Amino acid sequence: MEYYNEYLIQDEPNKCDKVRNWMAAIGLQDVDGLSPSKYMLETVRRNIEGEITIDEVERLVDEYYTTQEGLKQESRTLEADKVAVRIAKLLSHQTFGLGSNYLALIHRSLFEGIYKFAGTYRDYNISKKELVLRGESVRYEHAPLILPTLKYEFEQEDKFSYKDLTMEEMVKHISRFVANIWQVHPFGEGNTRTTAVFTIQYLKHLGFKVTNEIFADNSKYFRNALVRANYSNIQYGIKETTEYLERFFRNLLMDEKNELKNRYMIIGTSWNNETSTQENISSTQENISSTQEIQQSSRQTTTERIIDEIRKHPFTTREQLAKVIGITPDGIKKQLDKLKKAGKIRHVGSTKKGHWEIIE
């Protein structure tokens, strides 16, 4: 039959997929501490409702930042809005390429007009102090070796066969592969968001059923797990480990319920087995305050945690909040009612399809 020879044109994803794509797109901005504007959230709602297409969302957001109101927004809010739209667009596509060129294409697609170096490999070496490493840095790839290292990693992955592997073995391999790509850190900024988009698309390409909520809810954990997968200090008995990244992927691909806590990854704490390093690693005031910042987050009140979660994921549901916060849906409802009565939050739109806003 002739119609079998026709290619189907990729259309807008269904409502459920839209929500998941937007949750991941907005949640991944939290990796760099970015939050979307209220205008962006309202425009996203219209897309989810089917009122406008994702291309129209992109056009409206671009136009918003030429208005008087948009020009008052901070550059970080502009970045959060525009990159979130672009991530959602990429996640709605079924196209994929396993190679360094496609990785650069993702970066350029996300950050064109935001970073001058969008889609271009860095020509300088970098380091970054990490909270979970107490101020130490991962050793990122030497700039002249970025392209050959990426080519090697992608060639090895292309040759690799997942046939006859158990899910545990697949998760271990995927964790190491993704960690290796991230360690190269080929771009000046935006590496984790680029890696996350690439990873989601690759897993779908392999045939895995991927729900993006785990990336949305645990974007900082994802980055810190990548950090721990690429840091070692033999003097203090610290070895690079994909253990934490495997927990993330086991939740994603095997529907496990591993607890994903950033504090577990801090080197030299009682949360992990490297307690012997606690006395050996020098603790500058900066490192101490950084660790206290992570530990303080675990002592937040329930309402503070709910507000933080809503700020990161405005389209979250009561059920999702209950799961993240660790209390019953009824308990979440009571807390939300208290916050609404106190004038701290409001719900915009219908019960099932609306979003939360924080009243500053």
Where are these regions (language model features)?
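FIC/Doc superfamily catalytic core
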Residues: M1-E360
